[in-house]
């Protein structure tokens, strides 16, 4: 016999699978499939964002933005919302939603019908909704504007307080310096003035005698006494007679 024949004889033929082995395999397969199903978590369906807000909001925005004395008509509202938002090409559905929104607004007293009946006519906003109705973009802008305003006001207030405190401190410091310098100067000047006053009191300056104006003696005119005729001139005294000379002595013999 050849080597190939011996090898063929030595290999054992596999045993035929029994029914029990088939059942165990099937049960294992089902359990594995259930485990895989349990492991796979269900992915939640993510709803796509709507391309436009609800029709009632769009209608209120259109009525508030369209400026018409009589109020905007349904055609004007439709034109506004179709130009601003992407509503698609199905005009019948758009008109149906618009009519429903108008009727709903009239029932809830959000809109006031200026003229016409039902969805056909002109509309105005009620007083309550007119003050509340704003576009979402405008509301966001208002919110951002308020935030910016508050931040800028807070920053300005903080800087203003810092500047005010620094300026007040500087002014107070300068005021104190000025006050001290002025007080010191005034005190020094006061001391000097007191010293000078004391010196002046010690040294008595001679009093100047005010010269009284000399009374000019007015010469009174001498009154000439008129010689009255009664007054006679006093008699002149007789001239003294010369004394008689003594007789000369006779010569001696």
From Swiss-Prot:
Ranges of compositional bias, category Low complexity: 1-33
Keywords: Acetylation, Chromosome, DNA-binding, Nucleus
Similarity comment: family membership: Belongs to the histone H1/H5 family.
Modification type N-acetylserine: residues: 2
InterPro entries the record matches: H1/H5, Histone_H1/H5_H15, WH-like_DNA-bd_sf, WH_DNA-bd_sf
UniProt function note: Histones H1 are necessary for the condensation of nucleosome chains into higher-order structures.
Any Pfam family: Linker_histone
Domain of life: Eukaryota
Stated name of the protein: Histone H1.4
Gene that this sequence comes from: hil-4
Organism of origin: Caenorhabditis elegans
Compositionally biased intervals (Basic and acidic residues): 139-149, 188-200
Residues annotated as domain H15: 51-127
Location of region: Disordered: 1-43, 134-253
Molecular function terms, GO-annotated: double-stranded DNA binding; nucleosomal DNA binding; structural constituent of chromatin
Subcellular location: Nucleus; Chromosome
A single BP term in Gene Ontology: negative regulation of DNA recombination
Segments of skewed composition (Basic residues): 201-210, 234-244
GO cellular component: nucleosome; nucleus
SUPFAM superfamilies listed in its UniProt record: Winged helix' DNA-binding domain
